[in-house]
Amino acid sequence: MAAPGSEKSSKKKTEKKLAAREEAKLLAGFMGVMNSMRKQRTLCDVILMVQERRIPAHRVVLASASHFFNLMFTTNMLESKSFEVELKDAEPDIIEQLVEFAYTARISVNSNNVQSLLDAANQYQIEPVKKMCVDFLKEQVDASNCLGISVLAECLDCPELKATADDFIHQHFTEVYKTDEFLQLDVKRVTHLLNQDTLTVRAEDQVYDAAVRWLKYDEPNRQPYMVDILAKVRFPLISKNFLSKTVQAEPLIQDNPECLKMVISGMRYHLLSPEDREELVEGTRPRRKKHDYRIALFGGSQPQSCRYFNPKDYSWTDIRCPFEKRRDAACVFWDNVVYILGGSQLFPIKRMDCYNVVKDSWYSKLGPPTPRDSLAACAAEGKIYTSGGSEVGNSALYLFECYDTRTESWHTKPSMLTQRCSHGMVEANGLIYVCGGSLGNNVSRRVLNSCEVYDPATETWTELCPMIEARKNHGLVFVKDKIFAVGGQNGLGGLDNVEYYDIKMNEWKMVSPMPWKGVTVKCAAVGSIVYVLAGFQGVGRLGHILEYNTETDKWIANSKVRAFPVTSCLICVVDTCGANEETLET
């Protein structure tokens, strides 16, 4: 039962709302009468002359709606005493709409009139209409018009609209530079745009392509600007292959000594050692990286079953997979390449299979020095780390190894504090976190809840707060300073519970459980969402995908999207930006 005081408060609020509505209704009625009088030219004290049209109005109404008219009618300007006021360079229909707005507070903004309305609202200082136009244009921004909207916003002093348009231009630059609007830009705007660090591109060669495209559109007249334009391209960031085969062969470059020097400087950069490269600043600042994240699943025990999952549209796409069948392996993604390592068939597999997602090509490298299965792996700063695992039929290992992708060499690092296999491992903020697992593949082996972290800078391990639940074969993902352990199994069977490790607080907390118990869970995170895409329950596999929103702590069982059919699969998030579109066809 509600308290008497709360009932009175609620009643007062209701009464205030009703009173406000009544006041608004009365005001609208008064203004409606005044608008009718205006149309009948009753008591009008000013006529706006717009080209051939005469628009009657009341000074007090115009002055209350427009700061422009307020100054005009309340100062010693000539128009303050004139019955007829001429508005030069104005459109009659637009002024008619603005006058109507002054009386009714209503106006229709659409794609046909928004630019004219915004221009007039800005000139006559009618802020509500200006805001409506800005809000409308912000919703309409796309690749075909964003450059024009940015120019318009700058001319009309609309910083909020300009920021929206510019942000779109930078985020979608690879689409924008292929439009006609880009080709029509003046040299000042092009040089400013190409100089932005926030251009979102797959690689710097796209900025080069934009520059050359603009220059060639009107080559005779734009020839004098060639050096200024190409100076904004960061040639050291372009691949050596593209520089030598495409850029150096471009006639525009060959015919200009200054531009040729830029290209040669870019090629020299690739001959420098990593240490010497770090000393260079000019022309080497990276742009904002364009991403197209998908989740790759590889069949493992069924190698021909490999697919991408696209979290944007929930589609599955086949991946060509010729690699060897292997059980209990691991996979990681780094710099366009998926590395599949470890695992066994009859014996541990020594080879590491590599898949370049951009080139859609497979090749092999030497695998971990100690071949084993049930290991875990993750990547950080150009290095692939592998931990634990089990040599066939044996106990879990303390082993910790590192593969340097730059030198293509393996190195043994300090061992973990605890031996473990069938565990989880993730990179977070430059550190390597290892959680759970078991002391061996035998069913009787103890399942672990212990956790530890490795610092590559000091090459040391530190024990962390243990998980609330001991688990193995679980999913382990990093999302915004939290590490989530999802499902898996303890000594008694499958788990539906989920917990996260708060990195800052060094503590684990339980969250909402999965709507499914998984002995084996295959999951990955994109953004704030954790996707469970495959798994085994003990008597059957996961039928449909599950989604967990880490921000709302809510699970969704998506009955429209089937799960990946292979429960022993390998899973990792990949960036397919720049991949051949044929590779990604469904």
Curated annotation (Swiss-Prot):
Keyword Cytoplasm set for record: yes
Annotated metabolic or biological route of this protein: Protein modification; protein ubiquitination
Residues of the signal peptide: none
Highest taxon above the source species: Eukaryota
Keyword flag RNA-binding: no
Any one GO BP annotation for this protein: protein ubiquitination
Main location: nucleus
Transmembrane segments: none
SMART domains: BACK, BTB, Kelch
UniProt repeat feature Kelch, residue ranges: 294-336, 337-382, 383-430, 431-481, 483-528, 530-575
Task of the protein: Substrate-specific adapter of a BCR (BTB-CUL3-RBX1) E3 ubiquitin ligase complex. The BCR(KLHL7) complex acts by mediating ubiquitination and subsequent degradation of substrate proteins. Probably mediates 'Lys-48'-linked ubiquitination.
Protein name in the entry: Kelch-like protein 7
Protein source organism: Gallus gallus (Chicken)
Gene for this chain: KLHL7
